Amino acid sequence: MSDLSVEMPKLEINNPGDFPSPLISYIKNDPTFKELLDSNNYKELYSYVSNSSTVTGQLTHLLYSLGFDPLKELTFVPRNFLSSQHYPPTYVTIPDNIEYLDVNSFAISDLTTISLPANLRYIDRFAFYYTPHLQSIEFRGTKEQWKKVRKIPDWISGASITNVKNIICKDGKVKL
């Protein structure tokens, strides 16, 4: 296992037909996007594309394909981070520096298992919206710490709530 937070198949960058067209349009035509990509300022880069869920998810896929781990440089999981990515990252480990999950962080993805840090403070709405393959949410803190995490209504919703019944904490389970 690598030390990247998200494991997913690599994009075949040498084959233009396999490269996602919405993202390639940003790369080719948007000087601000290119400048932010070159700067490795992940906070600004994700903020810049946050209104396009497809591009945001494709950006995440590109960065991990190139061996970059943006989550290690941020304190939050960006909006639409894995959105519309149907390459099953079966297990995602959110690094300890992450304090909150933004809107739609993992929405509409093939995520199956996620491990959340003990210092997580906030989960925004639809963070786990329509993740039909999600089977397990692990929290690396205690049940008491989990209860203190501020969770906006509908933080887990759609097909996600069908499979996940409990949060697995280090000292036991908490029912959803």
Please place each PLM-identified region on the residue numbering.
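A structural signal for leucine-rich repeat
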Residues: R150-P153
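Structural signature of tandem-repeat unit edges
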Residues: M1-D18, S25-F76, Q85-Y100, S109-Y122, ...
